[in-house]
C-alpha cells in the first residue's frame, strides 16, 4: 500500500510539472494567432495528423525558443518512458522532424536509455510487489530465460531489445526483479534500440521535408529509405548467424555427451 501511494505521488508530481511546462508557453511572434502562441497547451500526438500539426507548431516555437522546446521535448519523452506510457514511437518521429536525423537519433537513444532506467528505478523502489502480483506468469517465464542466459546476459538483453519476446515496457518494469545490473540494463537499451530509434527518427525527418510527391522520389529520400531498410535487416541477419552458431555448439556438446556415454 505504501509503495502504491509513493508511486502515485511521484506520478502526480511529474504530471503536474509537465502540465505546467506545456501550458506556460512563451509567446512566439512567428505564430499568427494568440491561440497558437500561448493560450493553449501542447498535447501528446495520437495519430499522424496530430503529429504533423504538433511538429509544425513546435518548429515555429523553436525559431525563438530553442532551449524551451528542447526542454519540453526531453521532459515529455522521459515522462512517457519512466512511467511506461505507450506512444514513444510518435516522439521518435517528432524528434526527426524537429532536430533532424542525426541529432534526433542521438537524442532519442540517450532519452530512451535514461527514461528506461528511470522506469527501472521506480519499479525497484515502488513497483516490485505490484509487478509480481499482476504478472506472475510473465515474470516467472522471463526469470527462467534470464537465468538460462546469465553467462551472456548483456547479449541476451540486446536480443530482447532487437527482437522483443516481451514488450519493452514490461522488461523495464521487471528488470530489477530479475536482478539485472543497472549498468548492463542501461547500455543494452542504448545499443539495442538504435535500429528502432533510427527507423522512427529517419521517418520523421523524411516526412518533415516532403513538400510534394515529387520530393518523395528524390535521390536523397531514396538513400534515406535504403538506409532504413538496411538498418531493419542487419540486426536480424546477425542474430540469425549467432543463433545458428550457438545451435551448432549445442549440437556438438550433445554429440560429445552421447559419445562419452557409449564409451562408458
From Swiss-Prot:
Q: What family does the Swiss-Prot or TrEMBL record give for this protein?
A: Belongs to the TMEM41 family.
Q: Which residues form the signal peptide?
A: 1-17
Q: What does the entry's domain section say?
A: The VTT domain was previously called the SNARE-assoc domain. As there is no evidence that this domain associates with SNARE proteins, it was renamed as VMP1, TMEM41, and TVP38 (VTT) domain.
**Where does the record place the region VTT domain?**
96-207
The record ties this protein, via InterPro entries, to:
TM41A/B, VTT_dom
GO cellular component term, pick one: membrane
Matching entries from Pfam families are given as:
VTT_dom (PF09335)
**Mode of membrane association:** Multi-pass membrane protein
Q: What's the main place this protein lives?
A: membrane
Protein source organism: Bos taurus (Bovine)
User: This chain belongs to which protein, by name?
Assistant: Transmembrane protein 41A
